[in-house]
Amino acid sequence: SREWTDILANELQFEESDVHIGILDSGVNNAHPLIAQALPDSRMSTAINVQDNLDHIDHGTGMAGLVLMGDLTKLAYDRGNLPVVQHNLASVKIVDANYSTAPSFYGAVIEDAISQSQDMGADIDCMAVTDSISDDGKPTSSSAALDESIYHSGECDRLVLVSAGNIYQDEDRK
């Protein structure tokens, strides 16, 4: 709720840090009071052909909050005892509800997003978007792009956290 957001925003403390975590997702609404201090406009970008780098599907913003602060439910009950946030964010939009990337170009988008995120100072990237298309474990342009971006010409200096998919409780949604 807005009330909890205001309470947490007033109590959260941010420590200056060189650690940046890139959010490769649907963009981030960096004006959100819990995120604004950790994500300036200068560290927001897009790897797809859309007009802006903001989140219009409320996924990337939630991921940014989770990466920045962890479980907000726990924080809400730890008032007066909140941890100091010791990292910052970068955001590269790779999906949008009104834009469709051809599957054959997923790899190019991922490579571009990781590169942009690193250029904005990210040490670690988080890509928590999934695709319903399965190739039964065979390599795809996406997996090849991840491998190549992480290998980074032999430097192996990048850490990318990738979701393995969603778990559905409803048998009809498998």
For the regions a language model picked out, list residue spans one by one.
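A broad detector of the eukaryotic-type serine/threonine protein kinase catalytic domain
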Residues: 48-49, 130
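Subtilisin-like serine protease catalytic core
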Residues: 10-43, 50-105, 123, 136-138, ...
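Substrate-binding/access-modulating region of protease and related hydrolase catalytic domains
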Residues: 94-174
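Autoinhibitory propeptides
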Residues: 1-13
